[in-house]
Amino acid sequence: MERIRLDLSKTGSSVASYGETAEKFNALLDNGTGRGSDFLGWVHLPSSITEEELNAVEAAATILRERCDYVINVGIGGSYLGARAVIEALQNSFEAYRSDRENPVILYAGNNIGEDYLSELLQFLRDKRFGIIYISKSGTTTEPAIAFRLLKGLLESQVGREDARERIVAVTDSAKGALRRMADEEGYRSFVIPDNVGGRFSVLTPVGLLPVAVAGFDIRQLVRGAADMQAMTASDIPFSDNPALRYAAARNALYAEGKKIEILANFHPKMHYIGEWWKQLFGESEGKEEKGIFTATVDLTTDLHSMGQWMQEGERTIFETVISVENQDTCLTIPSDSADLDGLNFLAGKRVDEVNKMAELGTRLAHVDGGVPNIRIILPQLDAYYIGQLFYFFEKAVGVSGYMLGVNPFDQPGVEGYKNNMFALLNKPGYETESAAMAGRLKEC
């Protein structure tokens, strides 16, 4: 099988001088001796997933598929983005509207606290056959905990507590936490989130594999792609042949030149959530100690009609990483029209994908001409195998890139700030001192 390819020819920077450093940090990852070593379980995960583990995930997915028309994936951040990225990249864009669909529609909750969203979801699910996958290491993360309490109540009111427990699967800690306790007491089927795998690196654990399997996609191909990329980016692969190290080096070279913003661009609507997953992976891993490349995403050509002007002529603090897809499964040809009022007959007989590819090439050339360094990642096609490769490529790259930046890529202390303020404002037990301080602060506003 082919591998995804990396093109750095349009970056305008030399990465060779970063090779020795990148190789050193890659060895720290592979040996488990770098910063954040308690959370390096993802490094060798793809090649260590067993047949027994895959069988268990597929068996649980089969039960949910047989009993449910809708399955609600409850989680936030790394607890849901990876699965959603795979599902939305692979499924028919209009799957939810197809009368001949064979698998449950995957819906999402717990990724926001929008009352209108949750209310409308509950209204929609009334009298529907639905199940729940609740993903949380602790079971106390506010957004998914609220969503699960509401969904669990609705499900039990519709089918009874006994039947509801057969439609709920928990993915959580092996021994501790509110969700582990609830799963044990209620008798929910459950899977373990490994202690040494952080949320944003968890897509190849049951966190990502179970929802993907429920949606009907081949988790074995996903894992195989990741395992192959694990081998392609291992510490025994030299810098010159190691795509993850070269990408990490290019990012750091551009950052050193004042390029503080990386824009990940795709030209396929199905790839939107791959961008969202990437944005969390890199943003949460590197944005600390007042350092880090700001991660942004655009969906092209759509966003060329909004962000295109800024990308072409705005402040030159950006670089662009484009994910290209070489081959499409579909084939749609533009027809001829005798009147040709829209002037499109020059495209008659061409595939829509050919026009899209020329739009991509034209955009890349224009941005390079406008002073935007360009990195290109080429996928032979958009399928489970190459998405598996892509995920592991990005995971290994961000580990090395974070080390090169001088930060611990595997913690996220900054996310506690908003939570502490929110809990103080809501008078959560244990936050009395913070609540009093917050009250005084608000009086001054």
Swiss-Prot record:
Enzyme category, top tier: isomerase
GO MF: carbohydrate derivative binding; glucose-6-phosphate isomerase activity; monosaccharide binding
UniProt GO cellular component terms: cytosol
Active site per the UniProt annotation: E284, H305, K419
Pathway in which the depicted protein is active: Carbohydrate biosynthesis; gluconeogenesis; Carbohydrate degradation; glycolysis; D-glyceraldehyde 3-phosphate and glycerone phosphate from D-glucose: step 2/4
Disulfide pattern: none
Catalytic reaction(s) noted: alpha-D-glucose 6-phosphate = beta-D-fructose 6-phosphate
HAMAP family: G6P_isomerase
Designated name of the protein: Glucose-6-phosphate isomerase
